[in-house]
Amino acid sequence: PLKYAVYDGRQLALKISANSVYGFTGAQVGQLPCLEISSTVTGFGRQMIESTKNQVEAHYSRQNGHEHDAQVIYGDTDSVMIKFGTTDLAESMRLGEEAAGIVTKTFIEPIKLEFEKVYYPYLLMNKKRYAGLLWTNTTKHDKMDCKGIETVRRDNCDLVKEVVETSLRAILIRKDPQSAVEYIKGCISELLLNKMDLSKLVVTKALTRTSDQYASGNKQAHVELAARIKKRDPGLAPAVGDRIPYVMIKGAVGAKAWEKAEDPIYVLENNLPIDTAWYLEHQLSEPIKRLFEPILPDNVNSLLEGDHTRRIHKATPTTGGLMKFAKVTKQCLGCRSVLKGTDGALCAACEPKQMEVYCTKLKTVQSCEQLFSRLWTQCQRCQGDLHKDVLCTSRDCPIFYKRKKVQKDLRDAKDVLRRFDADW
């Protein structure tokens, strides 16, 4: 075992060294550019994949007495994926081991093709994008393996990752595509009605350089936002290397993406409306289409349009734009009619229902207090002390934005409740 471990470590070191040298030779700009070497390496790889494909498909065919015609459905770099046609897991593993042995005999030593795993079920979207349940034994799947899709990518908001992962679990594990369809429609409806938690809509990107170091015509959302934050408060200005969180808010017609990016805390404090259409079009639509095109080839657009997309929430901003010139008037808390010349809570018509309206607003305050207490206690447990203030400012934590939002909601709800003081 010791000798094997030494040799295994040695061959791994050689492999990493060879990979590094290959990377150097394939780089257009660098210390060791030599495209002939890198092209030769990839050429041999393609040749071996093609040879493997031809051997497997020729050997495992009905003409040779097999039950199904095998098909190599995917090949990339140093691996191939074979569809043997059988639905029996144990038989697939046996055929995989057997095929690896047959192909290895045709390779020059020490090149060896090894059987690694079985995907069942398996969803291949396109090159370098696939997902499936990974099996290395016949008793239980090891995990749900995803490559190149939004569950493992960092350039999407958490909503996209959650939607894709939940849908994949419904399709692959529960084998219930219809429940995935209903879930997608429900999420889109929640998004358009502005019921989605803000933490799920936050996009983060690394600030690799300052705004003046980018080309003048290449404005990026997170870079421009960093410059705006610096103007508002130089003490909060992000530094190069920081990850900038932002959400997209509604802007003027034809506004660019970099003009609509805004700090999530600033959005919460100023009640700025989220551009839900942008999230649907630029974040959700393509991943959903890629995921469901193999399942609903003729009806995939029904996920993005229909009854569930017809109700849209329109938020009212409290600052900026025309609100600078608007005069805020108080409304009756019962019927929402405009109150003239009074600081009270209700109009004359709603005065008889004063206690009923008050109890409704009081329940709102109590609900916010309960939610805030739960989130506050959860943050205290996380920092390891239930008797100190929460000092955490980690924006990567999903509770952070929930806590900030419920703090604002609680303040607003208490302000509403105080309006009854003028009547009593």
Predicted feature residues:
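DNA-dependent DNA polymerase catalytic subunits
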Residues: 2-17, 42-75, 82-386, 394-424
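Active-site-adjacent bridging/hinge elements
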Residues: 16-29
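Gly-rich Lys/Arg/Thr-decorated short loops/hinges at beta-loop-alpha junctions or inter-strand turns
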Residues: 26-43
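Short, hydrophobic beta-strand segments
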Residues: 28, 32, 79-86
